[in-house]
């Protein structure tokens, strides 16, 4: 999926907002997380993730040297994580093992995982089709505190565009 000029500008602006939250990014090596909802078709992921990462790399020197975590969210009980160079995730071979899994998932379970295992990440991009469910809005707000709400950027793929939602 090719990003439009508007989507590119929105992405850059939102990422800058996240990185400039007081106490978040201090100028050293950036640690970031890319969470992909396995409900997305393989072709969409294979096109969109590299486009997003290359856009960020072109945007700022901060993304030249990144500790990159790639997480595939398959179900509430199945989440796979890889630590790799960010540029590896821009190659088509990186997605050879990707398999689409449309299962019912709870947003709260993903947030709980991120709270426990990805607390060091200064930027968390979540690429989804929006098919997850939210069972308890209060629980979501609670899990967003103290840090997830300042670091999480939800990117929802629709048929022809990318919706960027800054979750505070």
What role is predicted for each listed range?
Residues 1-29:
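Negatively charged sequence features
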Residues 54-59, 112-116, 142-143:
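A generic secondary-structure signal
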Residues 168:
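Short acidic-hydrophobic, aromatic-tinged amphipathic segments that line or gate anion-handling sites
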Residues 49, 138-145:
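Conserved Walker B catalytic segment
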Residues 25-127, 131-137, 155-165:
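Von Willebrand factor
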Residues 60-63, 145-149:
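Arginine/glycine-rich "motif VI" loop of SF2 helicases in the C-terminal RecA-like domain
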């Amino acid at each position: 999926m090719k990003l439009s000029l508007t989507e590119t500008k929105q992405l850059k602006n939102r990422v800058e907002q996240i990185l400039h939250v007081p106490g978040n990014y201090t100028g050293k090596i950036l640690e970031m997380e890319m969470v992909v909802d396995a409900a997305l078709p393989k072709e969409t992921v294979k096109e969109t993730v590299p486009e997003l990462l290359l856009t960020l790399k072109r945007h700022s020197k901060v993304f030249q040297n990144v500790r990159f975590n790639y997480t595939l969210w398959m179900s509430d009980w199945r989440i796979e994580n890889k630590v790799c160079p960010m540029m590896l995730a821009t190659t088509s071979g990186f997605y050879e093992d990707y398999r689409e899994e449309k299962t019912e998932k709870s947003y709260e379970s993903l947030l709980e995982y991120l709270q426990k295992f990805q607390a060091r990440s200064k930027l968390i991009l979540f690429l989804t089709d929006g098919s997850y469910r939210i069972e308890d809005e209060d629980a979501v707000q609670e899990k967003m505190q103290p840090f997830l709400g300042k670091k999480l950027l939800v990117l929802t793929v629709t048929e022809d565009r990318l919706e960027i939602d800054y979750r505070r």
